[in-house]
Amino acid sequence: MVEPLLSGIVLGLIPITLAGLFVTAYLQYRRGDQLNL
């Protein structure tokens, strides 16, 4: 009965990883925008 725990961990990690990728992409976009200025 490890599947419920594993699925819970995966469902908990997916939004965190998506948020991390979104934040890093946003920071890189802002940095590139500042460099273009």
Swiss-Prot record:
Q: Which Pfam families match?
A: PetG
One example GO MF annotation: electron transporter, transferring electrons within cytochrome b6/f complex of photosystem II activity
Task: Using the record for this protein, list the coiled-coil segments as residue ranges, or answer none.
Answer: none
Sorted keywords for this record are: Chloroplast, Electron transport, Membrane, Photosynthesis, Plastid, Thylakoid, Transmembrane, Transmembrane helix, Transport
State the source organism's domain of life: Eukaryota
Q: How does it assemble?
A: The 4 large subunits of the cytochrome b6-f complex are cytochrome b6, subunit IV (17 kDa polypeptide, PetD), cytochrome f and the Rieske protein, while the 4 small subunits are PetG, PetL, PetM and PetN. The complex functions as a dimer.
Q: What is this protein called?
A: Cytochrome b6-f complex subunit 5
What organism, scientifically named, is this protein from? Chara vulgaris (Common stonewort)
Q: What is the lineage of its organism?
A: Eukaryota, Viridiplantae, Streptophyta, Charophyceae, Charales
Report which gene this protein is encoded by. petG
